C-alpha cells in the first residue's frame, strides 16, 4: 500500500516537527500525602493536565526500561525499524539502580506504539516501499501527539514493550495464528506478540474443570485482566440450581459460580496496577435462575446499606454502654456494671436493644469495661464505591445484563406466562408471569443500575455474519457484539481535532486518518496473541476492527447544535458514513495486497 503525507514533512525527524514541554503529575490523598508522583516528564505542548495525568499515571511503563539499548539486526527489515534490546555491556558500566527505570517521555510511548505497528505492518507486507513505511510512522506519531486519535488502553499498556525495550517474560498461556502459515502457535513469551485487544467475548460450557468450562474461564479471564483487557460471556449454558448432576446429586446453580468469578475478577486489577477488571455477565431471560440473578446486586446493595447503618449504630450504642460503665464514679466496682444499680447503663442497654444491637455485643462491652478498658473500637463503613463495605459484598466486579427476546417482550405486553427452561433436558422448570418478571428487572435497574438489557432478537437480526453462529453476548461496554470467542481492537478519532477555527470539518484529513487507523487496527490483529486457541482462531478468521470517533458532543456544541436535534443526527450520520465507507475501502485495499480474511464468504452487509 502507498501512503501520502498530510500532517508531516519528509526528510525531517518527526519529533523535531512537534513541540514538547516538561510537566509533572501527582496523586494525593485527602490528607495531602503523596500516592504517586512523576516529576520532570515530557509531554506534547498542547496536552492538558488531565491528558498528562492519564499518560503518566496509566500509560507510562513504570519499570524495566533499559538506560542503554542496542538494535537487533533483521535482514528483511529496514535498519530504522529494527527492534531494540538492553545493551548489557553499556548497562554494566552504570550503577545498578540506574540501569533500569520507567518511561518519562511521551516520545518514548509514541515511538513504542507506532514503531511496533510499523514493524509488524512491514513484516506483513502492507507497505509498497520503505518511504511508505516512513510516511505511515510519521503521520501516526503526529496524530497521537496532537490528540487526533488514540488506540484502546491495552495498546498503551502492552504494545512495543518487546520491540522498543526488549522487555519480555515467560508465556502466560496465550496463542496466535501465524500470519504467514495460518497455523496455530502457542506463544513462547509475554510481549513478543502483545495483547493489544480491549474487547473479548468468551464462551463457557456447562463443565466444571475441563477446557472451555467454568474454572477454565476464570483462568482465561485472568489472562485478559492481567494485560488490561475486558471480557464478556453468556452464562446461560450453566444448569440451574437443583438440576441433576451426572454423578448424582443436585447442582448448586448458576449464582454460586458467578460469585466465584466475581471474586476472581475483584482480586485482579486489569493491567496489573492500571485499572480494575472489566467484565460483562449475560444470562438469557429463560434461565431457571433468572430471578435470583436479576435481584443479585439489589440484595448486595442492601447488604452495604446494612453494613453502613449497622456499623455506625453499633459503634454509637456500644460506646454509650462503655461510657455509662466508665463514668459511674459514684458506684462501686460491682454496682457500676449492674444495670439494676447503674441507671445510665440501663438506659444505654435499652437504647442499644431498641436499635437492634446484638445482646452478646452489649454484654461483651460490659465485660470489656470490667477488665479496665475505657473505650471500645468498632469499625464503621461508608458507601464510597471503593470502600471495604463494597469489597465485602458480591457482584461488584461485573456489569450484569439480561438477554431478552421478542417472544418475551410480547409475553410482557400480553401479561402472559413465561417458561424457564432447564439446561439439562430442555424441559420447563417453572412458569412465571412475564409482566412480573419485567417489573423485577425494572425495579432492580432502578435500585442498583443493573441488570441492563440486551435485545437478543434485534441483535441477531442485525448480525453481519449469521452463518458463522449467533451472537450470545457482548464485551463489558457492549459496543462489541459478535460471535463467541472473538476479540476486537478499538481506536477513536477525536472529531474536534478535525474542526477548523472557522467551523469547517476537514473531511479530507478525516478520511486520511481513517485509512491510517484502519491499517493500524488490522496490523494489531496480525501481531496479537490471545488467551485461548478458540479466540486466536476466531479473531484471525474474522479480523474484527473497532474504529470509532470521540467528542461528537464537543463538535455539536461548537457547531451550535443541540444534542438531540435533526442537525446533530444528520452531522453524526454523515461522519459515521464517511468513516465507515473509507474504512471499508481501506479493507478492500488490504485484501488486494495480502488477501481477504478467511471468513469473508460468511459476511453479508
Residue spans of the language-model regions?
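Extended catalytic cores of very large enzyme megasubunits
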Residues: 1-603
Amino acid at each position: 500500500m502507498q501512503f501520502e503525507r498530510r500532517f508531516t514533512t519528509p526528510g525531517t525527524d518527526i519529533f523535531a516537527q512537534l513541540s514538547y514541554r516538561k510537566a509533572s503529575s501527582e496523586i494525593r490523598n485527602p490528607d495531602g500525602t503523596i500516592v504517586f508522583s512523576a516529576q520532570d516528564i515530557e509531554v506534547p505542548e498542547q496536552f492538558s493536565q488531565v491528558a498528562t495525568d492519564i499518560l503518566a499515571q496509566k500509560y507510562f511503563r513504570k519499570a524495566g526500561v533499559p538506560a542503554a539499548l542496542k538494535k537487533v539486526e533483521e535482514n528483511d527489515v529496514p535498519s530504522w525499524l529494527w527492534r531494540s534490546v538492553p545493551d548489557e555491556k553499556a548497562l554494566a558500566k552504570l550503577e545498578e539502580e540506574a540501569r533500569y527505570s520507567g518511561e518519562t517521555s511521551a516520545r518514548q510511548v509514541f515511538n513504542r506504539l507506532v514503531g511496533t505497528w510499523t514493524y509488524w505492518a512491514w513484516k506483513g507486507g502492507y507497505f509498497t516501499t520503505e518511504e511508505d513505511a516512513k510516511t505511515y510512522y510519521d503521520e501516526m506519531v503526529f496524530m497521537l501527539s496532537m490528540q487526533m486519535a488514540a488506540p484502546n488502553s491495552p495498546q498503551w499498556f502492552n504494545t512495543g514493550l518487546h520491540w522498543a525495550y526488549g522487555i519480555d517474560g515467560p508465556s502466560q498461556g496465550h496463542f496466535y495464528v501465524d500470519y504467514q502459515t495460518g497455523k496455530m502457535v502457542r506463544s513462547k513469551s509475554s510481549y513478543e506478540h502483545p495483547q493489544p485487544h480491549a474487547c473479548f467475548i468468551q464462551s463457557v460450557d456447562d463443565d466444571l474443570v475441563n477446557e472451555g468450562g467454568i474454572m477454565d474461564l476464570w483462568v482465561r479471564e485472568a489472562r485478559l485482566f492481567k494485560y488490561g483487557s475486558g471480557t464478556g460471556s453468556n452464562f446461560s449454558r450453566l444448569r440451574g440450581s437443583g438440576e441433576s448432576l451426572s454423578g448424582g446429586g443436585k447442582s448448586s446453580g448458576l449464582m454460586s459460580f458467578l460469585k466465584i468469578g466475581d471474586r476472581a475478577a475483584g482480586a485482579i486489577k486489569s493491567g496489573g496496577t492500571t485499572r480494575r477488571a472489566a467484565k460483562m455477565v449475560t444470562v438469557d431471560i429463560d434461565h431457571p435462575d433468572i430471578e435470583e440473578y436479576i435481584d443479585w446486586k439489589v440484595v448486595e446493595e442492601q447488604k452495604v446499606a446494612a453494613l453502613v447503618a449497622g456499623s455506625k449504630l453499633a459503634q454509637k450504642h456500644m460506646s454509650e454502654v462503655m461510657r455509662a460503665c466508665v463514668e459511674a464514679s459514684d458506684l462501686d466496682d460491682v454496682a457500676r456494671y449492674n444495670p439494676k444499680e447503674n441507671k445510665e447503663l440501663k438506659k444505654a442497654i435499652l437504647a442499644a436493644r431498641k436499635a437492634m444491637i446484638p445482646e452478646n455485643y452489649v454484654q461483651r462491652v460490659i465485660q470489656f469495661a470490667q477488665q479496665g478498658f475505657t473505650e471500645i473500637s468498632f469499625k464503621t463503613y461508608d458507601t464510597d464505591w471503593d470502600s471495604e463495605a463494597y469489597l465485602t459484598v458480591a457482584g461488584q466486579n461485573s456489569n450484569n445484563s439480561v438477554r431478552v427476546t421478542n417472544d418475551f417482550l410480547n409475553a410482557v405486553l400480553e401479561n402472559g406466562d413465561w417458561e424457564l427452561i432447564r439446561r439439562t433436558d430442555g424441559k420447563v422448570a417453572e412458569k412465571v408471569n412475564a409482566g412480573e418478571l419485567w417489573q423485577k428487572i425494572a425495579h432492580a435497574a432502578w435500585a442498583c443500575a443493573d441488570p441492563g438489557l440486551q435485545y437478543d432478537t434485534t441483535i441477531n437480526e442485525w448480525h453481519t455474519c449469521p452463518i458463522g453462529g449467533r451472537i450470545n453476548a457482548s464485551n463489558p461496554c457492549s459496543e462489541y457484539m459478535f460471535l463467541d470467542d472473538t476479540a476486537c481492537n478499538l481506536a477513536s478519532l477525536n472529531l474536534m481535532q478535525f474542526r477548523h477555527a472557522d467551523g469547517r470539518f476537514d473531511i479530507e484529513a478525516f478520511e486520511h486518518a481513517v485509512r491510517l487507523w484502519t491499517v493500524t487496527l488490522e496490523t494489531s490483529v496480525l501481531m496479537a496473541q490471545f488467551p485461548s486457541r478458540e479466540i486466536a482462531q476466531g479473531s484471525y478468521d474474522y479480523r474484527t476492527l473497532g474504529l470509532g470517533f470521540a467528542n461528537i458532543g464537543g463538535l455539536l456544541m461548537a457547531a451550535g447544535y443541540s444534542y438531540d436535534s435533526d442537525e446533530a443526527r444528520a452531522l453524526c450520520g454523515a461522519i459515521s458514513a464517511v468513516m465507515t465507507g473509507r474504512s471499508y475501502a481501506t479493507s478492500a485495499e488490504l485484501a488486494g495486497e495480502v488477501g481477504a480474511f478467511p471468513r469473508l464468504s460468511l459476511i453479508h452487509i
